[in-house]
Amino acid sequence: MLKILFMGTPEFAAVSLRALLEAGYPVVGVVTQPDKPAGRGGKLRPSPVKEVALAHGLPVFQPRRLRRPEVVAQLKELGSDLTVVVAYGQILSREALEISPLGSINVHASLLPRWRGAAPIQRAIMAGDVETGVCTMWMDEGMDTGDVCLTARVPIGPDTTGGELHDELARVGAELLLETVRRVEAGDAPRIPQPAEGVTYAAKLEPADEVIDWARPAEELYNQIRALNPWPGAYTNGPRGRLKIWRASVVPNPEPGAEPGTVVALVRREGFTVAAGDGALLVREVQPHGKARMDAQSFVNGGGVQVGTRFSPPEAPQREPAPGEA
């Protein structure tokens, strides 16, 4: 079996590492991002990939810059046949891509060339895509520009959240990776150049992406809310401060002339309706700042909103990176 050098950081990558190990592939080394401070205490937290590697007694490398010649030389000494890269978090130099004689294979959570870049899962939902998928790709020095090896398509349901799609794509991606490694080992792995048409970029999520702008159409806000569930969440500002909205539905606006961001109805046993730039959102689950998530009806019962309450965009929130985020 091929000897694998694995590079990855978050849980999405850990799923692929587990799959390789369960399939019996010898993983000669694991490269992941350095431990990062997390939580209020700032305690260093290992990446999910590091946790899997340590649990299996694998050598772990955490260079701050993989481009350094001495790091590349150290990894070459492991004697890997193929490098597998899944959400590692650093751009790889040509020297790093050539550590293994058979090259480097990447697992990317989109149907390339659509959604090249750092946040393809959330960007696909935010754009209202009804289909995405996973590609395995022969890596080159560009950002997700290499030849595609294998592809698997995955539908995006109208209620699918970012977390649900992440988990499904991680599972599908791990299966596709195993098939890709088998094809590489057999010598018949495809190399399909990406088309020049249809290229889009999935920019890294920034704090501004979390802000709910009620002047936008309700459909766009709905996609934003579900794309950012369960992390990092979408925010607005109300009379009681910042409010995170976790679940909502697009509904007709019962008060078409209302200013966007205005509560226009309280809906018994369901929540409250907020006017948007086009249509309205029936808010079903919220989280006041510093409190636990709750259904919107409980928030209404506690006096959180009433008809006429105004929400406005908050300043872009500061947040901690997700576990394993590069």
From Swiss-Prot:
Q: Give EC number(s), comma-separated.
A: 2.1.2.9
Pfam families documented for this protein: Formyl_trans_C, Formyl_trans_N
Q: Which InterPro entries match?
A: Fmt, Formyl_trans_C, Formyl_transf_N, Formyl_transf_N_sf, Formyl_transferase-like_C_sf, Met-tRNA-FMT_C, Met-tRNA-FMT_N
> Quick one: which residues bind (6S)-5,6,7,8-tetrahydrofolate?
110-113
Single Gene Ontology MF annotation: methionyl-tRNA formyltransferase activity
Q: What GO cellular component term, any one, is given?
A: cytosol
Q: Reaction(s) catalyzed by this protein?
A: L-methionyl-tRNA(fMet) + (6R)-10-formyltetrahydrofolate = N-formyl-L-methionyl-tRNA(fMet) + (6S)-5,6,7,8-tetrahydrofolate + H(+)
Kindly give the Gene3D superfamilies that the UniProt entry links to this protein. Answer: 3.40.50.12230
Q: Which keywords annotate this record?
A: Protein biosynthesis, Transferase
**Domain of life of the organism in this record?**
Bacteria
Q: Where is this region: Disordered?
A: 307-326
Give the record's family classification: Belongs to the Fmt family.
* PANTHER family attached to this UniProt entry: METHIONYL-TRNA FORMYLTRANSFERASE (PTHR11138), METHIONYL-TRNA FORMYLTRANSFERASE, MITOCHONDRIAL (PTHR11138:SF5)
Relate the protein's function as given in its record. Attaches a formyl group to the free amino group of methionyl-tRNA(fMet). The formyl group appears to play a dual role in the initiator identity of N-formylmethionyl-tRNA by promoting its recognition by IF2 and preventing the misappropriation of this tRNA by the elongation apparatus.
Query: Known NCBIfam families for this protein?
Result: fmt
What's the protein here called?
A: Methionyl-tRNA formyltransferase
Gene symbol of the encoding locus: fmt
